[in-house]
Amino acid sequence: MMTYYILIGAIALISWLVSSRLKSKFNHYSKVHLRNGMSGAEIAEKMLADHGIYDVKVVSTPGMLTDHYNPRNKTVNLSEGVYSQRNAAAAAVAAHECGHAVQHATAYEWLTMRSKLVPVVSVTSSLSMWVVFGGLLLGAGAGLGLGFYIAVAGLIMMGLATLFSFITLPVEYDASNRALAWLRNKNMVSQEEYKGSQDALKWAARTYLVAAIGSLATLVYWGLQVFGGRD
């Protein structure tokens, strides 16, 4: 169990460092003002229009770094700062979220797969740890029947969450690539602004990478606990 706490602690530390770096980057690039004077909302609306998407709304949502695309009601939700500000960070985030809208409109396969997993993972992710732990208490590690099968069921649930986190990676990287390509090809940003947008999105993507690695490490650890004691 101590190994688990050390592992989780290390992953939590790395996650905190990456998140802190991300916030620092966004604060820095928030000071790089766009030469075209467009706000994040205007950037988003133009990118959607340039891709022939007219059934998606751009709305403001409270908080910092709360930006997301909602495929259910087709809305690009931009945090208050991103929605109204006119800088490289806002342009990067707005274009990235619109990248998800473009994925949705073009039936991007990885986004489709992730969307199908959402309702399942939203339920199983909160239960998996308890199911595995319950199975271990019932003797899974010693190879006892009922406890073992309960623990395996928990591992499967945990595995779905891990799968979801890894499917998220190509979705996020592709959205960033679409955003950066559009910003560059449409001359929406200067070279300096483009570099800032690229750097900001790079650090945003790393938060998903750390989360995926953490999920896999947790799955492997508990898998060893369940299967390690069996002959």
Indicate residue ranges for each PLM-predicted region.
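Helix-coil boundary and interhelical linker segments in multi-pass alpha-helical membrane proteins
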Residues: 1-4, 137-152, 227-231
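Post-HExxH zinc-binding segment in Zn-dependent metallohydrolases
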Residues: 117-140
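Hydrophobic alpha-helical transmembrane segments of small proteolipidic membrane proteins, enriched
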Residues: 1-25, 153-155, 165-169
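Core hydrophobic alpha-helical membrane-spanning segments
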Residues: 7-14, 130-134, 223
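Polar-ligand-bearing catalytic/cofactor-coordination segments
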Residues: 19-124, 163-231
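Short, structured loop/turn "capping" segments at alpha-beta junctions
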Residues: 109-113, 127-131, 144
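Hydrophobic alpha-helical transmembrane segments of polytopic
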Residues: 7-11, 121-128, 150-157, 161, ...
